[in-house]
């Protein structure tokens, strides 16, 4: 829309502006907000192995995990014309969701016992699994999504921004 083009040449959201800074892309926005306004409790300390893993999750969400899920959605609109692509897309979905499912085995959150910004960045991936009706195949992902959706801050954000299709169904 023209309003967003006035803020950034790509005219896309999300976008955050603050002073001279204009930041696009969820991962970059999360990083910016935490560095400028965070209390230090949503990311591990920099220059640690945990921070490296955390950074991986910030980039993995949109760099790898979302692609097969989005392709599944788009190719589904092609009907029979998209049928030849489904096996490869399904293979990639299984590969990525299997990876996340395994990481979450025995953990409450991606980085361990505590919620981090990595969970926030990956939240849409988890929620879309439910929207696609796949929680039965990925119980650790389903439990993780329920945990973060049950958090008071998540509920407060929904109350402020309004419900959306991927949100809790209670």
What are these regions (language model features)?
Residues 154-170:
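Terminal-tail/helix-coil boundary detector
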Residues 58-152:
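GST-like fold's C-terminal all-alpha helical module
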Residues 1, 33-34, 147, 165-167:
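Short secondary-structure boundary/hinge segments and terminal tails
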Residues 19, 123, 160:
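Conserved residues at the C-terminal ends of beta-strands
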Residues 6, 150, 159-160:
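Phosphate-coordinating loops and pocket residues in cytosolic domains that bind phosphorylated ligands
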Residues 1-91, 101:
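GST-like domain detector, emphasizing the conserved glutathione-binding G-site
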Residues 34, 125-126, 158:
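Active-site-flanking alpha-helical
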């Amino acid at each position: 829309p023209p309003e967003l083009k006035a803020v950034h040449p790509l005219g896309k959201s999300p976008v955050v502006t603050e002073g001279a800074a204009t930041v696009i892309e969820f991962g970059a926005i999360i990083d910016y907000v935490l560095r400028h306004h965070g209390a230090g409790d949503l990311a591990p300390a920099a220059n640690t192995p945990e921070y490296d893993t955390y950074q991986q999750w910030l980039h993995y969400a949109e760099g790898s995990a979302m692609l097969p899920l989005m392709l599944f959605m788009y190719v589904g609109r092609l009907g029979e014309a998209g049928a030849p692509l489904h096996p490869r897309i399904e293979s990639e979905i299984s590969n990525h969701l299997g990876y996340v499912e395994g990481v979450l085995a025995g953990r409450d959150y991606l980085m361990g016992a505590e919620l981090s910004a990595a969970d926030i960045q990956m939240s849409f991936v988890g929620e879309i699994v439910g929207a696609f009706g796949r929680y039965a195949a990925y119980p650790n992902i389903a439990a993780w999504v329920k945990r973060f959706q049950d958090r008071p801050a998540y509920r407060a954000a929904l109350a402020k921004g309004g419900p959306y299709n991927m949100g809790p169904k209670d």
